[in-house]
């Protein structure tokens, strides 16, 4: 209020929407737990053998990696096909792609899907998840897409359309040629396991009891992100048809070469 002596407006310094619980939260600051008595702990959520996901690190004897074939001729679409509408009209899909059901991707052989056990209690993340991927490619360039997903129970009372729904919480892509420098792109060594570390967008989300956590890894996200020929060329915009080649992609999950997503877990109220 501009008027002297007017009552305080009661506006919080930060008002943030919390997905999962679907509630507005009044916060003294952001990140959500920068206030006394509240702690955010960066916690690795490991990709494990058997396409599982958990907070326990891989152990000796586990299968060392999972692999898939990435083909630029059949890229993973960013949303289910057919993709209709590109404007911002009410009947188009563009405005809803961030909450699109990801089952269209998890069913593909060129997408690795890792899933946790059913949660017995709420799991809250507030901040930026960070992907730590140890991966190799048979090509000389590669894209790595990591998606953090909330998997709903098979049955949701009162909302049957949400049964088994795979809701994207945070996701991003990293182009391998920029692993060492954005200014000086560099070809990847075929077959060499390299570490890729990149932050996903900020999330303020609660995975509810009965839900599961999922991480998807893929190498295309078309047409949201342009296709990588998977052969290093000075400029992808000038890539020739012959530069676009299939590649075998491996994601490692063994001691010493563990892949994980670091979650900003809220560990106190």
Please tell me what each predicted stretch does.
Residues 1-269:
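C-terminal, loop-rich substrate-recognition/catalytic regions characterized by aromatic stacking residues
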């Amino acid at each position: 209020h501009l008027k002297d002596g007017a009552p305080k407006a009661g506006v919080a310094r930060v008002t943030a929407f919390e997905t999962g619980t679907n509630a507005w939260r009044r916060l003294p600051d952001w990140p959500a737990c920068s206030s006394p008595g509240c702690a955010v702990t960066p916690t690795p959520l490991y990709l494990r053998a058997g396409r599982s996901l958990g907070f326990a690190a891989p152990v000796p004897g586990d299968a060392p990696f999972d692999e898939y074939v990435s083909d630029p001729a059949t890229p993973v679409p960013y949303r289910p096909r057919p993709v209709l509408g590109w404007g911002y009209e009410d009947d188009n899909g563009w405005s809803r792609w961030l909450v699109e059901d990801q089952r269209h991707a998890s069913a593909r052989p060129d997408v690795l899907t890792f899933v946790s056990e059913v949660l017995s209690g709420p799991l809250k993340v507030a901040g930026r998840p960070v992907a730590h991927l140890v991966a190799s490619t048979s090509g000389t360039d590669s894209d790595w897409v990591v998606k953090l997903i909330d998997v709903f129970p098979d049955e949701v009372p009162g909302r049957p359309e949400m049964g088994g729904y795979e809701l994207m919480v945070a996701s991003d892509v990293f182009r391998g040629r920029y692993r060492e420098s954005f200014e000086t792109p560099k070809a990847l060594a075929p077959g060499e396991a390299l570490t890729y570390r990149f932050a996903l967008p900020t999330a303020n989300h609660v995975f509810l009891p009965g839900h599961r956590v999922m991480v998807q890894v893929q190498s295309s996200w078309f047409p949201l992100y342009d296709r990588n020929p998977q052969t290093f060329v000075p400029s992808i915009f000038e890539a020739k048809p012959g530069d676009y080649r299939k590649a075998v992609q491996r994601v490692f999950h063994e001691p010493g070469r563990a892949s994980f997503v670091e979650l900003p877990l809220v560990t106190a109220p």
